[in-house]
Amino acid sequence: MTELLWAVVALLAGLAGGAGIGVYWANNGVSSLVQRKAAEARLLIEEARSQQKEILLQAKDEALRIRNEAEAELRESRQSLQKQEERLQRKEENIDRKLEGIERRERLIQQRERQIEQLTQEAERLKRQQAQELERISQLSREEARSIILAEVERETREDAARRIRELEQQTKEEADKIARKIIGLAIQRCASDYVAEMTVSTVNLPSEELKGRIIGREGRNIRAFEQITGVDIIVDDTPEAVTLSCHDPVRREVARVALLKLLKDGRIHPSRIEEVVHKTQLEIEQIMREEGERVAYEANVQGLHPDLIKLLGRLKYRTSYGQNVLQHSLECALLAAHMAAELGANVNIAKTAALLHDIGKAVDHEVQGPHALIGAEIARRLGRSAAIVHAIAAHHYDEEPQTVEAFLVIAADAISGARPGARRETLDLYIKRLEALETVATSFPGVQRAFAVQAGREVRVMVQPDQIDDLASIHLARNVAKKIEESLQYPGQIKVTIIRETRAVDYAR
């Protein structure tokens, strides 16, 4: 019994000890877990704070950048506004100066008119006095003395009138030039064309050199069929991966170019397929021309054009003059002529319609003989345009003498559009040869010392020998030089001929 009791006590003691040890280790494990979690929490908090600082820094940098950009834009806007204000102020000052100049000239004219009136009265008084004196001295009859006096007065009056006419002509010319520059400037500003010159491309690039053989075909049947159907010559030479299309008709050349590209893309190249593709392409190009003609007529606000005129107008899309697209040139002329007609109080509809159609003859000038201005005028007449429009078209290159304001406006619009920088271009060799030819023509006249082609060939300045060419001969020389340039040279726009005659008188004070 005692042994059993001790055994039970020992068992209980062991259990108690094991339980204590278990509790001890459990407490230690929980404590270490808590410490690890706390460390992890602190680490997360530090990372969050670090990220918060980075985000705040980035936000501050972005805010600073946005603020700097806004300040820069604000400065630019202020500078732009300041420049605009300065330009407006300068324009206002120029206008004020011009108005003051006009008022001064008006006062001067009135003063000169009063002086002329006084001089006329004085001349009458002197005439009477001279008549009395002559009659007294020479014992001439009154009629004889009257004839002598009238002859003298007539001579003096003619001189005064000629001098006055020259002054008025010069003043009128200055005023007219000033008004013309203003009207042209307003028209150009309102037109604001952004078109640049272009060249017609007649070269078709090939994906590979092997396609040249397929274009030629067996024994040349493909190329012969293509040339026969389109009327365009295909030049296959040593140019790598390219063939050239040659034809005087730009529409046929465009049809051939588009059809050849379609055949190359399709891959089937044989005579029957060529005929089918060319026929479809012709219909497409005709549709494109009609659409282009309608578009340009709509943009120019010209209504009621005959469908054939619309089609011919669209054909100008494929014509160029010195690199300038003729269709776009016609639209630009129409807008310029309309604005100038509105400023002058002329018929806007006649001016813009004639300007839009002024080069319509170029659409068929390779088919019809004659100047394109007269060809276009005849087409416009047959298709129902008014006589005023027909005359303006025919006169825009002086094939007819211009008789109406609208005709002169078409001439001016054509010259402005062609002379605009960047509108037309020539090769360097042709440009240099044209300048040399201008100088050669001018120096071929006797009495000419030197000649200079300036303003990109738009003006020729001729220096003459003052002892051989007087003022009257200078006028004839300018006319003769201009006439010879017209007869012997080809050039876009117009060329101004300026004769410069300089005389010097030198003496020495000793």
Curated annotation (Swiss-Prot):
The chain crosses the membrane at residues 4-24. GO terms for molecular function: RNA binding; RNA endonuclease activity. Residues 200-260 form the KH domain. PROSITE patterns: HD (PS51831), KH_TYPE_1 (PS50084). It is a single-pass membrane protein. It is found in: Cell membrane. Belongs to the RNase Y family. This is Ribonuclease Y. It comes from Chloroflexus aurantiacus (strain ATCC 29366 / DSM 635 / J-10-fl). The lineage of its organism: Bacteria, Bacillati, Chloroflexota, Chloroflexia, Chloroflexales.
